[in-house]
Amino acid sequence: MKIKQSTFYAFRILYRIDKGKDRVVTSKEIAEKEGYSPGMILKILRVMGQNGIVRAHQGRGEAGGGFSLEKSIDEITFLEIIRIMEGVDISANLDETSREKHTRMFLTCIRMNEELELLLSQYTVRDLFESGETGSFLDAV
C-alpha cells in the first residue's frame, strides 16, 4: 500500500484547522502556511467536508468564510482519513466473483486487509501531532 501525497496533505490541513481552534481557517491561510496550491487544498477540503470531517462556513469581509473541524482530531482515525482520501482494500484487485474468491491468496488478502484496518483505526490524527521520542509529525527528521 502506498499512501498518496494528497492524503498526507489532508493530515496537515487538519492540523492547521485544529490550530485555529476558536475560529474558521481559510483555505488561503492553509495554502500559505503549508506551501500547497490553493486548488489542491480546496479539493481535499471538499472531500473531507462531504465526509463529515470539516465544515465549510460561508462569509465575506470581516466575517469571512473558512473551515472548522466537524469533530475533534482525537476522534478522527488514520483509517477514516485514508478511507476517505483513497480507500483501504488490499484485496480490491481480486475479483470476488471469480475462482480467486476461494483461494488462499484471496483469503490471506482479506485477513491482511482486516488487520491493516484494525491497526489504522488505533491511531488518531492527534497522535500525529503529539511529541514523542521521535518528535511530532511536523518536526523535521
Task: Name the predicted role of every residue range.
Residues 6, 57-67, 71-74:
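Short, Lys/Arg-rich nucleic-acid/phosphate-binding segment
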Residues 14, 45-46:
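Short, hydrophobic-biased segments on the C-terminal half of alpha helices
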Residues 18-22, 71-72:
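Short helix-capping/hinge SLiMs at alpha-helix to coil transitions
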Residues 39:
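Key DNA-contact positions within bacterial/archaeal DNA-binding proteins
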